[in-house]
Protein backbone atom coordinates (compact mmCIF):
# COMPACT_ATOMS: atom_id res chain seq x y z
CA UNK A 1 0.00 0.00 0.00
CA UNK A 2 2.79 2.45 0.88
CA UNK A 3 4.08 2.31 -2.70
CA UNK A 4 0.86 4.03 -3.80
CA UNK A 5 1.46 7.01 -1.48
CA UNK A 6 3.52 10.06 -2.32
CA UNK A 7 6.72 10.48 -0.31
CA UNK A 8 5.40 13.10 2.12
CA UNK A 9 2.28 11.07 2.95
CA UNK A 10 4.25 7.83 3.27
CA UNK A 11 6.63 9.48 5.73
CA UNK A 12 3.73 10.87 7.77
CA UNK A 13 1.98 7.49 7.88
CA UNK A 14 5.19 5.81 9.03
CA UNK A 15 5.59 8.18 11.99
CA UNK A 16 2.04 7.39 13.13
CA UNK A 17 2.39 3.60 12.93
CA UNK A 18 2.50 1.38 16.00
CA UNK A 19 6.15 1.12 17.04
CA UNK A 20 6.37 -2.68 16.82
CA UNK A 21 4.57 -2.82 13.47
CA UNK A 22 6.79 -0.05 12.14
CA UNK A 23 9.97 -1.85 13.16
CA UNK A 24 8.79 -5.09 11.52
CA UNK A 25 8.02 -3.14 8.35
CA UNK A 26 11.36 -1.31 8.28
CA UNK A 27 13.33 -4.48 8.99
CA UNK A 28 12.42 -5.83 5.55
CA UNK A 29 13.28 -2.63 3.66
CA UNK A 30 16.72 -1.74 2.29
CA UNK A 31 18.47 1.11 4.10
CA UNK A 32 18.52 3.21 0.93
CA UNK A 33 14.73 2.93 0.60
CA UNK A 34 14.22 3.98 4.22
CA UNK A 35 16.46 7.01 3.71
CA UNK A 36 15.14 8.22 0.37
CA UNK A 37 11.49 7.20 0.69
CA UNK A 38 10.90 8.22 4.29
CA UNK A 39 13.69 9.97 6.22
CA UNK A 40 14.31 12.58 3.51
CA UNK A 41 10.71 13.75 3.99
CA UNK A 42 10.62 13.84 7.80
CA UNK A 43 11.38 16.50 10.37
CA UNK A 44 14.62 15.77 12.19
CA UNK A 45 12.95 14.65 15.43
CA UNK A 46 10.69 12.16 13.62
CA UNK A 47 13.66 10.84 11.63
CA UNK A 48 15.63 10.30 14.84
CA UNK A 49 12.74 8.35 16.38
CA UNK A 50 12.71 6.04 13.36
CA UNK A 51 16.47 5.56 13.15
CA UNK A 52 16.79 4.87 16.89
CA UNK A 53 14.75 1.71 16.35
CA UNK A 54 17.43 0.24 14.05
CA UNK A 55 20.64 -1.52 15.08
CA UNK A 56 23.87 0.47 14.76
CA UNK A 57 24.89 -1.02 11.41
CA UNK A 58 21.56 -0.18 9.81
CA UNK A 59 21.62 3.29 11.36
CA UNK A 60 24.94 4.00 9.66
CA UNK A 61 23.67 2.63 6.36
CA UNK A 62 20.55 4.82 6.46
CA UNK A 63 22.59 7.91 7.33
CA UNK A 64 24.97 7.25 4.45
CA UNK A 65 22.05 7.35 2.00
CA UNK A 66 20.60 10.69 3.18
CA UNK A 67 21.31 13.14 0.37
CA UNK A 68 20.98 16.32 2.44
CA UNK A 69 24.32 16.52 4.32
CA UNK A 70 22.96 19.14 6.74
CA UNK A 71 19.97 16.94 7.60
CA UNK A 72 22.23 13.93 8.13
CA UNK A 73 24.45 16.00 10.42
CA UNK A 74 21.46 17.18 12.46
CA UNK A 75 20.26 13.60 12.88
CA UNK A 76 23.71 12.40 13.98
CA UNK A 77 23.84 15.20 16.57
CA UNK A 78 20.34 14.42 17.87
CA UNK A 79 21.10 10.70 18.21
CA UNK A 80 23.76 11.58 20.80
CA UNK A 81 21.14 12.76 23.30
CA UNK A 82 19.32 10.49 25.72
CA UNK A 83 15.85 9.88 24.31
CA UNK A 84 14.29 10.68 27.71
CA UNK A 85 15.63 14.25 27.65
CA UNK A 86 14.72 17.41 25.78
CA UNK A 87 17.69 16.82 23.47
CA UNK A 88 16.32 13.44 22.48
CA UNK A 89 12.86 14.84 21.78
CA UNK A 90 13.70 18.10 20.01
CA UNK A 91 13.81 18.91 16.32
CA UNK A 92 16.03 21.43 14.58
CA UNK A 93 13.52 22.96 12.14
CA UNK A 94 13.16 26.57 13.31
CA UNK A 95 13.02 30.09 11.96
CA UNK A 96 15.92 31.98 13.54
CA UNK A 97 16.75 35.68 13.21
CA UNK A 98 19.50 37.87 14.65
CA UNK A 99 18.72 40.47 17.30
CA UNK A 100 20.48 43.30 15.42
CA UNK A 101 18.61 42.80 12.15
CA UNK A 102 16.20 45.41 10.83
CA UNK A 103 12.63 44.48 9.96
CA UNK A 104 13.35 44.20 6.19
CA UNK A 105 16.35 41.93 6.87
CA UNK A 106 14.24 39.86 9.23
CA UNK A 107 11.43 39.46 6.69
CA UNK A 108 13.81 38.41 3.91
CA UNK A 109 15.46 35.74 6.01
CA UNK A 110 12.16 34.48 7.40
CA UNK A 111 10.82 33.93 3.88
CA UNK A 112 13.91 31.93 2.94
CA UNK A 113 13.82 29.74 6.05
CA UNK A 114 10.05 29.26 5.98
CA UNK A 115 10.20 27.63 2.54
CA UNK A 116 11.68 24.51 4.16
CA UNK A 117 9.02 24.18 6.87
CA UNK A 118 5.46 22.93 7.09
CA UNK A 119 4.58 25.01 10.15
CA UNK A 120 6.08 27.96 11.99
CA UNK A 121 5.31 28.12 15.70
CA UNK A 122 7.62 30.92 16.81
CA UNK A 123 10.46 32.99 15.38
CA UNK A 124 13.48 32.72 17.67
CA UNK A 125 16.00 35.50 18.17
CA UNK A 126 19.70 34.84 18.79
CA UNK A 127 22.85 36.94 19.18
CA UNK A 128 26.05 36.58 17.17
CA UNK A 129 27.09 33.61 19.34
CA UNK A 130 23.77 31.83 18.63
CA UNK A 131 22.58 32.32 22.22
CA UNK A 132 18.82 32.58 22.63
CA UNK A 133 17.79 36.17 23.31
CA UNK A 134 14.09 36.30 22.64
CA UNK A 135 10.99 35.25 20.76
CA UNK A 136 9.64 37.33 17.93
CA UNK A 137 5.83 37.34 17.65
CA UNK A 138 4.70 37.58 14.03
CA UNK A 139 2.12 40.23 14.93
CA UNK A 140 4.85 42.53 16.22
CA UNK A 141 6.76 42.16 12.98
CA UNK A 142 3.73 43.34 11.01
CA UNK A 143 3.04 46.32 13.26
CA UNK A 144 6.63 47.50 13.91
CA UNK A 145 8.27 50.32 11.92
CA UNK A 146 10.73 49.10 9.29
CA UNK A 147 13.57 51.01 10.99
CA UNK A 148 13.14 49.00 14.20
CA UNK A 149 15.71 46.41 15.21
CA UNK A 150 14.53 42.94 16.14
CA UNK A 151 15.93 43.33 19.66
CA UNK A 152 13.64 46.31 20.26
CA UNK A 153 10.43 44.45 19.45
CA UNK A 154 11.21 40.87 20.49
CA UNK A 155 9.81 39.30 23.64
CA UNK A 156 12.82 39.00 25.96
CA UNK A 157 13.72 36.19 28.38
CA UNK A 158 11.61 33.49 26.70
CA UNK A 159 10.73 30.27 28.47
CA UNK A 160 13.21 27.57 27.45
CA UNK A 161 14.47 24.15 28.51
CA UNK A 162 17.98 22.69 28.63
CA UNK A 163 19.04 19.78 26.41
CA UNK A 164 19.36 17.59 29.52
CA UNK A 165 15.94 18.50 30.96
CA UNK A 166 13.92 15.29 31.54
CA UNK A 167 10.98 14.85 29.18
CA UNK A 168 8.52 14.90 32.10
CA UNK A 169 9.71 18.41 33.01
CA UNK A 170 9.45 19.52 29.38
CA UNK A 171 5.83 18.39 29.34
CA UNK A 172 5.14 20.26 32.58
CA UNK A 173 6.73 23.44 31.19
CA UNK A 174 4.67 23.38 28.01
CA UNK A 175 1.47 22.76 29.98
CA UNK A 176 2.25 25.38 32.65
CA UNK A 177 2.90 28.19 30.17
CA UNK A 178 0.41 27.01 27.52
CA UNK A 179 3.07 26.91 24.81
CA UNK A 180 2.77 25.45 21.32
CA UNK A 181 6.56 25.01 21.24
CA UNK A 182 9.49 25.53 23.58
CA UNK A 183 13.09 26.34 22.57
CA UNK A 184 15.94 24.10 23.73
CA UNK A 185 19.33 25.52 24.72
CA UNK A 186 22.72 24.03 25.54
CA UNK A 187 24.94 24.62 28.57
CA UNK A 188 25.95 28.12 27.43
CA UNK A 189 22.52 29.21 26.28
CA UNK A 190 22.88 28.57 22.55
CA UNK A 191 19.67 27.70 20.72
CA UNK A 192 19.96 24.11 19.49
CA UNK A 193 16.38 22.99 18.87
CA UNK A 194 12.69 23.20 19.64
CA UNK A 195 10.02 20.88 21.00
CA UNK A 196 6.44 21.29 19.78
CA UNK A 197 3.25 20.44 21.59
CA UNK A 198 2.71 17.70 18.99
CA UNK A 199 6.05 16.14 20.00
CA UNK A 200 4.92 16.24 23.62
CA UNK A 201 1.56 14.66 22.87
CA UNK A 202 3.30 11.86 20.97
CA UNK A 203 5.53 11.27 23.98
CA UNK A 204 2.57 11.28 26.39
CA UNK A 205 0.80 8.72 24.19
CA UNK A 206 3.88 6.50 24.01
CA UNK A 207 4.34 6.68 27.79
CA UNK A 208 0.70 5.71 28.28
CA UNK A 209 1.14 2.74 25.94
CA UNK A 210 4.26 1.61 27.81
CA UNK A 211 2.49 1.94 31.16
CA UNK A 212 -0.47 -0.05 29.81
CA UNK A 213 1.80 -2.81 28.50
CA UNK A 214 3.63 -2.95 31.83
CA UNK A 215 0.36 -3.10 33.76
CA UNK A 216 -0.96 -5.82 31.44
CA UNK A 217 2.19 -7.86 31.96
CA UNK A 218 1.96 -7.52 35.71
CA UNK A 219 -1.71 -8.54 35.76
CA UNK A 220 -0.90 -11.65 33.72
CA UNK A 221 1.84 -12.61 36.16
CA UNK A 222 -0.45 -12.36 39.18
Task: Label each region the model flagged.
Residues 1-218:
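Hydrophobic packing positions in regular secondary-structure scaffolds
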Residues 222:
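Conserved structured catalytic cores and adjacent interaction surfaces
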Amino acid sequence: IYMQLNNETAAEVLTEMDEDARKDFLDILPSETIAKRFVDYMDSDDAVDIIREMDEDKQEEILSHIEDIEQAGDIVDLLKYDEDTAGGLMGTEMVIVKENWSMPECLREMRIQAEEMDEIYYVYVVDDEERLRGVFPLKRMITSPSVSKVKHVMRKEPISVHVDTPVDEVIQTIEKYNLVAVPVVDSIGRLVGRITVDDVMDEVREQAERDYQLASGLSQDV
